[in-house]
């Protein structure tokens, strides 16, 4: 059984990957997608979204990182995948699930679920282009506006050479609205001969256990649930290993929140850093009442030094 951290554009960047993997329980993580159009990208484009390539493709906690590509041109994706491997990517993941309209309009992500033959050709081209010891994997949704083609899409990926398939148990049109249709993950798992990971609407350990029961799949990829409850992967891993299952208290999260902010201040432009903190803190309000109070204090602030002072007060009060 494996527990993975999902790739989420504009959310799970290098900073959040670093912080979340240090909590524990995550077996591997994936970069935000690197968009491939009609040319070979320079190394700087890969290092921008996957700086861990310079550190053995691992986060500071030692968690392996995989590089995700998104596009619709099999040959161009293959060339860029091969180059990513030269830069140190240990696994190439292919995105067939992004629901963003801007991405879909440029023929990327979930819109490709309308074309299973092209999905097959993309995976096959990338599989041929990268060294045999490097796995090619894929992530899909159940379909564009209906799950009727889910099995054909999954078979296309597996037959093309995908070592496993992650299934976000919703269609593109569903977006992120509940429920996740875990019963369709079970159907996909029966249709292909490669491992299948379930993804979608797992916010708690109990959710994971229900997902496992309904889907028959034990491997899980956690997205918003893990961002909102950073100890979730650790809880699932403890359940798997027969260890102690405990909640992550706010006092344990605070040092990570502080480090997240310090990294954001150092690595992002001043106009972007506050938004990233508010984004994560806003998601933490789902789990932590303390996050609700802290979010209320900073939500209208855009000056980094002001936020520094407000955070320091909050951290001091919690100590």
Swiss-Prot record:
Protein's UniProt keywords contain rRNA-binding: no
Active-site residues (renumbered): 98
Assigned keywords, A-Z: Flavoprotein, FMN, NADP, Oxidoreductase, RNA-binding, tRNA processing, tRNA-binding
Cofactor(s) for this UniProt protein: FMN
GO molecular function, one term: tRNA binding
Pfam families in alphabetical order: Dus
Binding site for FMN: 7-9, 68, 139, 199-201, 223-224
Catalytic activity field: 5,6-dihydrouridine(16) in tRNA + NADP(+) = uridine(16) in tRNA + NADPH + H(+); 5,6-dihydrouridine(16) in tRNA + NAD(+) = uridine(16) in tRNA + NADH + H(+)
Site features described as Interacts with tRNA, chain residue numbers: 35, 95, 176, 276, 278, 299
EC number(s) given by UniProt: 1.3.1.-
HAMAP family xref list: DusC_subfam
Family recorded in the similarity comment: Belongs to the Dus family. DusC subfamily.
Function: Catalyzes the synthesis of 5,6-dihydrouridine (D), a modified base found in the D-loop of most tRNAs, via the reduction of the C5-C6 double bond in target uridines. Specifically modifies U16 in tRNAs.
Protein known as: tRNA-dihydrouridine(16) synthase
Species this protein is from: Pseudomonas aeruginosa (strain ATCC 15692 / DSM 22644 / CIP 104116 / JCM 14847 / LMG 12228 / 1C / PRS 101 / PAO1)
UniProt lineage: Bacteria, Pseudomonadati, Pseudomonadota, Gammaproteobacteria, Pseudomonadales
